[in-house]
């Protein structure tokens, strides 16, 4: 590794195998970042790392597994000198009416969307503090408003927003905390819904109006590239034609 490579910022991205995570990896790599791609689907992040070249490393990790995250953090420290930016992007959106039939979905959303971001940040925090870092938490428009059928998903995003504000106050000015709240984005998330009627409704809604993952990634890159005296704390993004929350 040459001196120029050593000076480039390092961004760790969870959920990097697709959607906003993969798009953000491409955007930050284009801006000169060395990216560490974390996800469960190792084949996808390996292919993405190959696409991006030697600026990227692929690390198999599940954000619900603290031991896996500790191993990932150790590898980032050893191979890249530590993280400067953490993008907490891993998430699931398992919408549906509230019932005991959905109880596993509820647990999964809480473990991934909320506890996953908290644990990943806890594990990487010392690295981020060492040189002036950024934490970017990918929330949702559902973190501002709830609607029928998205109650637990919204709860995880409201929780993420509340924790992010507390974290921002604790870590300033050395580590900036940014919350990104996308509306409808063309990603895999709606396809993972297990409640069939809700899945069909979401597919129809998403077929009418979305933005791309690249649109969101561009905003993330803008936020982390601001001068250190400026912090962008919260960004709400919707397709221009999205009327519903």
Specify the residue positions occupied by each region the protein language model found.
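Active-site helix of classical SDR
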Residues: 121, 156
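Conserved glycine-rich cofactor-binding loop
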Residues: 17-18
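Conserved glycine-rich Rossmann-like NAD(P)H-binding loop of the short-chain dehydrogenase/reductase
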Residues: 31-48
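C-terminal helical subdomain
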Residues: 179-180, 199-245
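Residue(s) in the substrate-gating loop at a strand-loop-helix junction
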Residues: 140
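The beta1-alpha1 cofactor-binding region of Rossmann-like NAD(H)/NADP(H)-dependent oxidoreductases
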Residues: 61-71, 103
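Substrate-binding pocket helix/loop in short-chain dehydrogenase/reductase
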Residues: 97-98, 102-107
